[in-house]
Swiss-Prot record:
Protein name: Protein ImuA
Keyword terms of this UniProt record: DNA damage, DNA repair
Keyword DNA repair found: yes
SUPFAM superfamilies the UniProt entry points to: P-loop containing nucleoside triphosphate hydrolases
Cystine residue pairs: none
Leader sequence segment: none
Function, in words: Along with DnaE2 and ImuB is required for the error-prone processing of DNA lesions.
Stored InterPro entries: ImuA (IPR017026), P-loop_NTPase (IPR027417)
GO BP terms: DNA repair
Induction: Up-regulated in response to DNA damage in a RecA-dependent manner.
Length: 244
């Protein structure tokens, strides 16, 4: 091996150039942690962001195998819903935490553990020190970490939720539900869809899309691109959150 050469960082590809091209390595890198938050009420309920994360991790476990650790302070992770998205629930390890500090500590431990493909923690806002510790844990074994931002039980006393630093994570996403299309047989609802905004990416660029869950066994990638959001749509949504 020549001196100075580096092994390329493994990535999780979305299978869509318009998405993968936002990342410097051509896909969402492993060996790092990412922030996912909701828009509007989803900031508290976390339903759409959790479904998006579940779908994302399904693509990773299909490729790597291994366990998935999910750390939360609430007992509202709905296992049948995970199965409906094709998530391998047999690989799921659920852990209840008492407070924010324990949540982040458990996430760090999970990311440092051999045999864990991915770890998710429902937390409000890790500070810079906690974020750096999470990154070191990811680098130790090439783990994939997600901090799913949720306000604790209706928000913090005194009003607005604490702002997210986001400075130590590789990327930050904002997720909202989107109307489903008709199913192939025109009966019931089609696969779930999400409005997905990549707000920040280290060394990359932001973007926005409507993505649909790809059914298990229908391809190597967990999502299907429905449409790409125009730049002005993403900018308008960001301005509305900032000044609304």
């Amino acid at each position: 091996m020549e001196a100075g050469t580096r092994t390329p960082t493994p990535v999780l590809s979305f299978g869509e150039p318009s998405i993968d091209g936002c990342f410097p390595g051509g896909g969402l890198p492993l060996g790092g942690w990412h922030e996912v938050t909701g828009a509007g009420l989803e900031d508290e309920t976390g339903a759409a962001p959790a479904a998006f994360v579940t779908q994302l991790i399904r693509g990773l476990t299909d490729r790597k195998g291994g366990a998935v650790v999910w750390v939360a302070r609430r007992a509202d992770l709905f296992a049948p819903g995970l199965l409906g998205l094709g998530f391998p629930a047999a690989r799921l390890i659920q852990v209840r935490a008492r407070d924010e500090a324990e949540t982040l500590s458990l996430l760090e431990d999970a990311l440092s553990t051999q045999g864990v493909a991915a770890a998710v923690a429902e937390a409000e806002a890790p500070d810079l020190t906690a974020g750096r510790r999470l990154q070191l844990a990811c680098e130790k074994r090439g783990g994939f970490g997600v901090v799913l931002h949720r306000r604790p039980y209706g928000g913090r006393a005194g009003g607005k939720p604490r702002l997210v630093s986001g400075s130590a994570s590789f990327s930050r996403w904002r997720i909202a539900p989107a109307p489903s299309g008709p199913p192939p047989d025109d009966i019931g609802l089609g696969p779930p869809r999400w409005r997905v905004e990549l707000e920040r990416c280290r060394g990359g660029r932001p973007g926005g899309w409507i993505l649909q869950a790809q059914e298990a066994g229908h391809g190597p990638h967990p999502f299907r691109l429905v449409s790409q959001l125009a730049d002005h749509d993403v900018a308008a949504a960001e301005a509305g959150r900032r000044f609304g």
